[in-house]
From Swiss-Prot:
Keyword Hydrolase among UniProt keywords: no
GO biological process, one term: nitrogen fixation
Purpose: May protect the nitrogenase Fe-Mo protein from oxidative damage.
Gene designation: nifW2
Coiled coil regions in record: none
Superkingdom of origin organism: Bacteria
Organism this protein belongs to: Trichormus variabilis (strain ATCC 29413 / PCC 7937) (Anabaena variabilis)
Stated induction or repression of this protein's expression: By anaerobic conditions.
Protein name per Swiss-Prot or TrEMBL: Nitrogenase-stabilizing/protective protein NifW 2
Matching Pfam families: NifW
Keyword list, A-Z: Nitrogen fixation
Length: 105
């Protein structure tokens, strides 16, 4: 498979990435988990770039393809809430008293 890094850099939507890499996907899954798939994919790209500085563009694109496939597969069996990729899911709520913290008299 021959991919072009310049074409890759112009891609914007999740569907464009799947089409570029010719990966099959369920549009319903992408529609529901789009931001989460792209966030996971973006984090993977950063790791790939950091850990494979000597890799050729073709090798990196192959790794990117695998990363997109893995990011998608996570959300076939999991939900965005379970994955907690975004900061808002990791923040502890303020001014909340948990029921377990209420002492009974």
């Amino acid at each position: 498979m021959t991919w072009d890094i310049e074409q890759f850099n112009k891609l914007v939507s999740a569907e464009e990435y799947f089409e570029f890499f010719q990966l099959p996907y369920d549009p319903r899954v992408v529609q529901v988990s789009r931001l989460h798939i792209l966030k996971q994919f973006s984090q993977s790209i950063q790791e790939i770039d950091a850990n494979n500085s000597q890799a050729s563009q073709a090798e990196k694109l192959d790794l990117y393809c695998t990363a997109l496939k893995q990011a998608y597969e996570v959300f076939l069996s999991s939900t965005p809430l379970e994955q907690k990729l975004f900061k808002v899911f990791k923040q502890k709520p303020k001014n909340i008293v948990m029921l377990t913290e209420i002492a009974t008299s």
